[in-house]
Regions:
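Solvent-exposed, non-transmembrane regions of membrane-associated and secreted proteins
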Residues: 1-167
């Protein structure tokens, strides 16, 4: 079976029959029809955007190595749309390091969080370093906020955190 056919078969598993696509080669960009682009289910988009560091990243449930090798991970113990939403990602040493520039954020910087079609804006209000055993920044809260956590370079027992409050 040639490479184009293998690629085409794998697409059949993720693109419904009623969607028109143009397939050139497995190494080219697949041109998806305008009909498909207009029908993308915005209810399923889950992402974080941080304009200051040019970050737009998908989010997935969990913080396992497998999840964080492809996504920003969501701490399952935290809510997804209200209260204190906890997210984690790598900042170096992996194929995908979404939080590599998190250290550049400052108070007042904008973070845009999209979940279930709802877009929420947050403003950074707290930045700091915590022990890797300190989970207090992820505690439940009646205030809507995002907590971003990543490793601290060359200090494996510490974590960098950013908290942002909903605007």
């Amino acid at each position: 079976m040639n490479q184009d056919k293998v690629f085409e078969n794998s697409l059949e598993k993720i693109i419904p029959d009623n969607i028109e696509i143009e397939l050139k080669t497995p190494n080219s960009t697949v041109a998806i029809s305008e009909q498909y682009q207009n029908n993308i289910d915005t209810q399923k988009i889950w992402q974080i955007e941080i304009p200051k560091i040019n970050l737009v990243a998908p989010i997935a449930e969990g913080t396992s190595a497998n999840i964080m090798n492809e996504y920003v991970g969501h701490f399952a113990e935290t809510p997804k749309n209200k209260g204190n939403i906890g997210l984690a990602a790598h900042n170096r040493g992996y194929k995908i390091n979404y939080f590599r520039d998190l250290k550049l954020l400052q108070k007042g910087d904008l973070i845009i969080y999209t979940y279930n079609g709802e877009i929420s804006k947050y403003s950074v209000n707290e930045l700091g370093i915590i022990k890797d055993t300190d989970w207090s920044k992820l505690e439940s809260s009646s205030q809507d906020k995002l907590t971003l956590i990543t490793c601290l370079e060359d200090e494996p027992e510490y974590r960098r955190y950013i908290q942002a409050v909903k605007l």
